[in-house]
């Protein structure tokens, strides 16, 4: 039996934890996840998906502000290996060294490309046609450890970040389990990351505003890359309208001002980018309302009209 301590917080983390927990070759002897967060709207405490799974399956769960605070407790578990999936917290070197096989980290990009906390968003924003699942040894430098194995896959050109996440969530758990078994079996295949890295850091608030001066392909990639969350937006009459799906239509034959609505139909809202390029906004979200197709919005009262502007 392989004794594991799991570090993770997100929905992807929970999927990987569940797969490890259900595999008869593993024993999950402890889980470390982020401290609970308080919902500012209703003041209720929100558990991470990982903590909820631990409660349901009676797995010891630790939630330190800093993981070095539980070094003694983790040492007492005498685990063989640590596993990290989207933990969201720096792991101290003293914690890494508790485990004979160190800590294996799953990262959903073709490392050394897109080190950081938002590789899925940046895969779509950058228009990548391929990506990878990477299992690396966790080291102090962010996502810089030697690579155990990578599993390449094609990125569907129609995917947004949500679609890519669903793919990763479906395929990552079993790939991770395969790698863990190989690591503990003593096979020695670690390879250092040699090529220069790029970074896929967390999306900043100011990056959520879409740029109408981009080339059409880049604009569409930003729409897809920010969808469904956090959602890229454009300003319209004082409101931030999220643009969750858009398509490039082509170039206007006449000169059109950037951001101007040129046509509204059941297919969507046509607006101009720079150089008279036209994109079709198909799914949008008005503040306080759910995301809707434009075909549904125009059936009711709405503020949009030809000649008005997005900014």
From Swiss-Prot:
Which cysteine residues pair off into disulfide bonds?
A: none
Recite the UniProt keywords alphabetically.
Protein biosynthesis, Transferase
Cellular component (GO) terms are: cytosol
Q: EC number(s) for this protein?
A: 2.1.2.9
- What highest taxon heads this organism's lineage? Bacteria
Listed under catalytic activity are: L-methionyl-tRNA(fMet) + (6R)-10-formyltetrahydrofolate = N-formyl-L-methionyl-tRNA(fMet) + (6S)-5,6,7,8-tetrahydrofolate + H(+)
Tell whether Protein biosynthesis is among the UniProt keywords.
yes
Q: Does the keyword Translocase apply?
A: no
**Binding-site residues for (6S)-5,6,7,8-tetrahydrofolate, renumbered to this chain:** 109-112
Xref: Pfam families: Formyl_trans_C, Formyl_trans_N
Please give one Gene Ontology molecular function term for this protein: methionyl-tRNA formyltransferase activity
Family per UniProt? Answer: Belongs to the Fmt family.
Summary of the function given for this chain in its UniProt record = Attaches a formyl group to the free amino group of methionyl-tRNA(fMet). The formyl group appears to play a dual role in the initiator identity of N-formylmethionyl-tRNA by promoting its recognition by IF2 and preventing the misappropriation of this tRNA by the elongation apparatus.
The protein's matches in NCBIfam families, at most eight in alphabetical order, are given as: fmt (TIGR00460)
Q: What is this protein called?
A: Methionyl-tRNA formyltransferase
Quote the gene name from the UniProt entry: fmt
